[in-house]
UniProtKB/Swiss-Prot annotation:
UniProt keyword Disulfide bond present: yes
Major localization class: secreted
Tissue/organ expression: Expressed by the venom duct.
Signal peptide positions (record): 1-19
Changes after translation: Contains 2 disulfide bonds that can be either 'C1-C3, C2-C4' or 'C1-C4, C2-C3', since these disulfide connectivities have been observed for conotoxins with cysteine framework V (for examples, see AC P0DQQ7 and AC P81755).
InterPro entries: T-conotoxin
Native species: Conus pulicarius (Flea-bitten cone)
Name of protein: Conotoxin Pu5.6
Length: 60
């Protein structure tokens, strides 16, 4: 019966540790949303016709 309170405390500590960042962010870190936006923008640019501007405005 002595182990039950210790076990409960350990479970609470493990659950609260998941919300803590393991590593601090550096100035070189970029959020994933900006990476996804860049990939979509590059994909859109490849679909555009270089000589016909109206082609870029038509969603496919």
């Amino acid at each position: 019966m002595r182990c039950v309170p210790v076990f409960v405390i350990l479970l609470l500590l493990i659950a609260s540790a998941a919300s803590i960042d393991a590593q601090q962010k550096t100035k070189d870190d970029a959020p994933l949303t900006s990476l996804n936006d860049n990939a979509l923008q590059q994909h859109w640019n490849k679909r555009c016709c270089p000589r016909k501007i109206w082609c870029c405005m038509i969603p496919r």
